[in-house]
Amino acid sequence: VVYTDCTESGQNLCLCQGSNVCGQGNKCILGSNGEKNQCVTGEGTPKPQSHNDGDFEEIPEEYLQ
């Protein structure tokens, strides 16, 4: 599982795979072709300060389809 930090709404690209690391009240949305995913304003999980196991919450499966 790969985690990519993204903190600026609509600016930073994010992987959206296995976790939502947008933080700051943002959520990660998938690009149409699986690329250029973006953080947008919306419910999201907090962005942790470290990259240790257990710091990330999994994205519910319905968002991975």
From Swiss-Prot:
Disulfide bond among keywords: yes
Record flagged with keyword Glycoprotein: yes
Instruction: Tell me the segments the record calls region Disordered.
Output: 40-65
Q: Which residues are glycosylated?
A: T45
Task: Give Gene Ontology CC terms.
Answer: extracellular region
Annotated spans, Interaction with fibrinogen-binding exosite of thrombin: 55-65
Q: Where is this region: Interaction with thrombin active site?
A: 1-3
Q: Where in the cell is it found?
A: Secreted
Write the record's keywords in alphabetical order, separated by commas: Disulfide bond, Glycoprotein, Protease inhibitor, Secreted, Serine protease inhibitor, Sulfation
The record ties this protein, via SUPFAM superfamilies, to: Leech antihemostatic proteins
As stated in the Swiss-Prot or TrEMBL entry, residues carrying the post-translational modification Sulfotyrosine are Y63
Biased composition regions of type Acidic residues, renumbered to the chain? 55-65
Which InterPro entries does this UniProt record tie to the protein? Hirudin (IPR024793), Hirudin/antistatin (IPR011061), Prot_inh_hirudin (IPR000429)
Q: From the record, give the cysteines joined by S-S bonds.
A: C6-C14, C16-C28, C22-C39
Principal localization reads secreted
GO molecular function per UniProt: serine-type endopeptidase inhibitor activity
- Primary role: Hirudin is a potent thrombin-specific protease inhibitor. It forms a stable non-covalent complex with alpha-thrombin, thereby abolishing its ability to cleave fibrinogen.
Family membership, please give it.
Belongs to the protease inhibitor I14 (hirudin) family.
| Protein name (record) | Hirudin-3B'
Organism field: Hirudo medicinalis (Medicinal leech)
